[in-house]
């Protein structure tokens, strides 16, 4: 099972651009399975566009080693090669003392070779020192190659090669990419601009990244590095239960998915379907009303960017307000459920207002516990999730919260998951993953 991790020496070295370019280049002749280490839900949409295969998250905070291996094998078993984009620097996780949440932990769990990606601007001999330090820091890792990004030119590359080969004759130099503003990618406060906002433009951009990779990197060398003999052991006993709880329900779930709402973990969709749910996607901006369904799932996104468009679709707002089934709103979906976003009218189901701030209000892995049974969890059960938002709720006139936050921020006073309409509607900031909250799919899909 061919696999390789593209790991940065730090953040902002070009991981998403170059990893996506590698995925696109390989996809011209191979069936590529993409992955993202960590909880990011935007980067995987670029991978998916590049490969036409849905990118998945591998996260050692949400998942234990058995679950990571199980998910990896599930999605990679019929593919030619898997490319895993790391998060931050290779060793960054939730603690300065252990691997949890890091790229290194995932690489070890799936026994994957690693190609280091380094911003080599103004570096020569220091590049060799960085590589030597990374290789010696953890002997369990298999760092096989290096890619230099943002080099000045051929003379710079030759010096880099000479320095690295002098101090480390084993590491493969996979290639180097020159400084080029066309390789940059648009960002905003929560990260990259999501793919649903720029489909045609993005397709051309990703093709350019792929062409650049083919021109500058040794693709055959990447395939050679990825070709490892070790098969990943997976405990197949109760394999569904090792990932998430499964109850055979028969519900129909309508999921908000457009330019305003698109922050989802696709494993959540799999978990819902394995629990018997039929999924249908709709646009709160463009569609007249919600589809015929039993449950609404309003995920995260950028409703603050599209607040006027959402507010103008009065038929959709009326349709959701009149819906008498279960509604789950997550982060952006929570904001949509409130009275307003920055003064622009929204659904007015949760009696509070959403405002945007200049500073991050929540950025953390989350550990929480359910105070009671609710539409996404069981009383006293714990869950692991993620939060990242610049918004906050004000004028809160609700006092029924479904879960309390032990690690993280929540809505207010370490509480999250506002519950209204006798628990039929829940809105919270924590982004739930079906592995981190194994009851998520079985509870949400239940009629």
From Swiss-Prot:
Domain of life: Archaea
Record has Plastid as a keyword: no
Site annotation Increases nucleophilicity of active site Cys: residues: 431
Record-level Gene Ontology MF annotations: ATP binding; cobyrinic acid a,c-diamide synthase activity
Xref: SUPFAM superfamilies: Class I glutamine amidotransferase-like (SSF52317), P-loop containing nucleoside triphosphate hydrolases (SSF52540)
Enzyme class: ligase
UniProt cross-references to InterPro entries, sorted A to Z: CbiA/CobB_synth, Class_I_gatase-like, CobQ/CobB/MinD/ParA_Nub-bd_dom, GATase_3, P-loop_NTPase
Alphabetical GO biological process terms: cobalamin biosynthetic process; methanogenesis
Pathway annotation: Cofactor biosynthesis; adenosylcobalamin biosynthesis; cob(II)yrinate a,c-diamide from sirohydrochlorin (anaerobic route): step 10/10
Additional record remark: The a and c carboxylates of cobyrinate and Ni-sirohydrochlorin are activated for nucleophilic attack via formation of a phosphorylated intermediate by ATP. CbiA catalyzes first the amidation of the c-carboxylate, and then that of the a-carboxylate.
Protein name, UniProt field: Cobyrinate a,c-diamide synthase
Originating species: Methanococcus vannielii (strain ATCC 35089 / DSM 1224 / JCM 13029 / OCM 148 / SB)
